[in-house]
Each structure stands twice: as C-alpha cells, then as structure tokens.
Design a protein with these regions (language model features):
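Short glycine-biased active-site loop of nucleotidyltransferases that positions the nucleotide triphosphate
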Residues: 36-44
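Glycine-rich beta-strand-to-loop/alpha-helix junction loops that act as flexible
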Residues: 29-34
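Acidic, low-complexity, intrinsically disordered interaction modules
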Residues: 249-283
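General alpha-helical segment detector with a strong preference for membrane-spanning helices
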Residues: 36, 50-51
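Structured mid-to-C-terminal alpha-helical surface segments
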Residues: 1-27, 40-41, 52-249, 258, ...
C-alpha cells in the first residue's frame, strides 16, 4: 500500500464531506484517522469514521458519501440497512480499499472545530476519543493490536479521559473497568496483536510492541491511572439524573420530564426534530442516552441554581 496516496484520498474525501453544506451539519469526524490527522498518532490508519449526529438523515448522509466516493473510483462494497452504514471505495487496483463508516450510536460525545487544509471539521475531543478507545479494548470480539497501541499512545501523553463515557458504555465504574483492562492485557498474546497492527507502525515502537515492552508499559500506566485518573470534568455530567421521560400534551406537544437529585423539574417542550431523533434511534440504550442528553441540555441552568442555593456558604 502507498501510504501517501491513501492519505491523500482520505484528505480529499474529508474536504468534500465537510465542505458539503448538509453533511457538515450532521457528521463529526472520529476514530483512528482523526487521531492520525489531528492528534499525531504515530501509526497509519486506513478508514474514515464519522458519527451521524442526526439519525433521521441516515439515508441522505449515506447517499452523499456514496456520491463522494464515486468521484475517486468504484464502490467495492456498501450497506445501508445495517445500523451503521458503510461505503467501501476502491480507488485503484492493487491499493488498499478505503472504508467510509457511519456510526448511529448515541453517546455523550463532545466535538471541537479543527482546520485541515482550509476546511473546518468537527472532531471528537481527545478525552472522549480516549474513552471510546479504552472501551473498544474489551468491547470487540477479540483484542486488537491497534487498540492496545492507541491506548499506550494516550497514556504516554498523559491525555485526560472522559470517564463518564466508559461507565456509560461498559456499565461499570471506571476504576473497575481499568482492572478488567489490566487483567486482559496480562494474558494477551503479543504475536496475535502484531498480526493486525505490525504493518502500520515502524521503528522503536514496532520493536517494543513485538517484544511485549509496550504492553507491559501500558499495564503499568493503567495501574497509575487507578491512583491518578486524569478525568475530564464536564459540568453538565455532574447532574445526578435519576429518570427522564417524554410525554405528550393535549395540544400534541412533546414534553420532557426529569427527576434530578430527588426533585422533579418543570416540564420542557422539545422540538419535533429532537423527538424524531429519539424515535429513530435503533437501540434502547441509545434512546436512554439521548434522553439524558436532553435533560442536561434543558435543565442544567435550573439544576445549577438549585445546587448553588442548597450549598452552604462559608462564613468569613
């Protein structure tokens, strides 16, 4: 594979995607390639991963990605009906195919605009990226070398992590999940990990991966994170949300109800678009996550005022 050529095609497709007035509003860039382009990940990535921010636009986004891919070659494979649409571009015979993947899952992600070759791109922030990468370590059918390598990368640069995403995805406390990761890494085969990452890393890091030193150091740094976790705090994530539901008023409006810290919060009307997204999410877990997101968006200011009133002030 010609890495420079592959990276150039990825760059051109990214520019096409985020210069499109519709796609730029509903897609965000994430995954290994975003780490390579924006966070100096020292290994090569071959696919483009996007989060679909509005699932009601899934078919439109898929068709537009397909049209963009066809500018550069033929479609080697594709799928729309699956929860996560996929377009596989074959841009040249004998070269690595380029996958364009859409994720429809909903988590409490955060994004920031970054510029790439004159194009503004919403990119998942580093703490959230680290969290999803740590989840992927044990969330796949089998542990992969690139996940281990990337986790070592985040730990080595002392990157903060959004622990809330880990707990949301893995359904356990962050510290307990770290123990699971450590236990799994202590038994993994270095030879097996090298099979799917060896060609994408080089030099000293490749030798450390092959010898097992990189895995040992990753375990050591995960142990350190149990003591010094470097957790990124988002103010809205501090809301102790106990229950969120959507009901309908006699006038047909969509009404949000929430129970936060033992108190019922006032009804808030949500938009037709928000209700459509809620209905379109395919999994119960995603709908629950979206309701929590709506509660944080709609009740944060009110909850914060109540919290401030209930917090005793220090007397001078």
């Amino acid at each position: 594979m010609n890495n420079d050529k592959h990276k150039l095609y990825m760059l051109r497709i990214l520019k096409d995607v985020f210069n499109d007035p519709e796609l730029s509003q509903i897609l965000a860039f994430k995954g290994d390639a975003s780490l390579m382009f924006f966070y100096q990940l020292p290994r090569f990535s071959v696919d483009l991963d996007f989060n679909l921010l509005d699932i009601t636009q899934k078919e439109m986004a898929y068709q537009k990605l397909r049209e963009i891919a066809l500018k550069y070659g033929r479609i080697a494979d594709e799928q729309l009906k699956h929860n996560d649409p996929l377009v596989v571009l074959d841009y040249e015979k004998g070269e690595q195919n380029l996958k364009l993947k859409l994720s429809t899952r909903f988590f409490d992600n955060h994004y920031e605009l970054k510029n790439l070759a004159g194009t503004n791109i919403p990119v998942m922030v580093e703490p959230d990226m680290f969290a999803h990468k740590l989840c992927a370590l044990l969330d796949r059918d089998g542990m992969t070398g690139h996940d281990v390598f990337d986790i070592h990368f985040f730990l080595s640069k002392q990157a903060p992590i959004h622990a809330g995403i880990v707990e949301q995805r893995m359904k356990k406390l962050f510290a307990n999940y770290l123990d699971d990761c450590i236990a799994a890494l202590q038994t993994v085969s270095t030879k097996e990990l090298m099979q799917n990452v060896g060609e994408f890393i080089e030099g000293k890091l490749k030798q450390e991966m092959k010898s097992g030193k990189l895995i040992d150091r990753t375990i050591e740094m995960l142990e350190e994170r149990k003591i010094v976790p470097f957790i990124t705090e988002y103010p809205r994530n501090r809301m102790p949300i106990e229950d969120v539901t959507i009901t309908h008023s006699p006038e047909g409006k969509n009404i949000l109800l929430a129970q936060i810290a033992g108190k019922s919060f006032m009804e808030k009307e949500i938009s037709t678009k928000e209700f459509s997204i809620f209905q379109a999410l395919p999994k119960d877990e995603d709908r629950k996550n979206f309701l929590v997101h709506l509660a944080r968006e709609n009740y944060f200011d009110e909850w914060q005022k109540q919290s401030d009133r209930n917090t005793p002030s220090l007397k001078r």
